[in-house]
């Protein structure tokens, strides 16, 4: 199976965009843009996401225990792009403030289990609390572009 063609096939599935954020210290965070976010269970509230084992950011996230998931709105393309190539930001920076202000929702989570499947590390996490921010259009990724 040709990996490039397989990736093209999978790109035909429209997904939302989320950002995983975990604290480094009281001043800064690590963050990464993902489209692998999924709800697993409503009761108890479990979610999942996955991380490419060959990603340059793998070491920043492989052992996280607590993290937040921000579900992005259509207004947040620049933030999505920023955290696709940058992983660190100051906690009080404009990019983090805009992430918090304009996201559709925030879920605060704790990692329950991690599994390695193929070339990805799969995280299963319990949602500890959540906040619904707004009712605007989501940021959608389809066929390699935002919609």
Language-model features and meaning:
Residues 1-147:
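Basic, polyanion-binding surface patches
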């Amino acid at each position: 199976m040709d990996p490039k063609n397989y990736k093209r096939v999978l790109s035909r599935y429209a997904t939302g965009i989320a950002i995983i954020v975990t604290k480094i210290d009281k001043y800064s965070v690590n963050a990464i843009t993902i489209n692998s976010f999924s709800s697993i269970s409503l009761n108890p509230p479990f979610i999942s996401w996955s991380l490419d084992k060959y990603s340059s950011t793998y070491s920043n996230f492989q052992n996280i225990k607590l993290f937040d998931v921000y579900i992005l709105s259509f207004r947040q393309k620049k933030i999505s792009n920023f955290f696709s190539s940058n992983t660190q930001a100051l906690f009080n920076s404009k990019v983090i403030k805009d992430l918090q202000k304009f996201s559709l929702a925030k879920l605060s989570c704790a990692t329950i289990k991690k599994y390695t499947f193929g070339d990805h590390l799969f995280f299963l996490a319990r949602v500890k609390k959540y906040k619904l921010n707004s009712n605007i259009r989501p940021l959608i990724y389809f066929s390699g572009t935002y919609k």
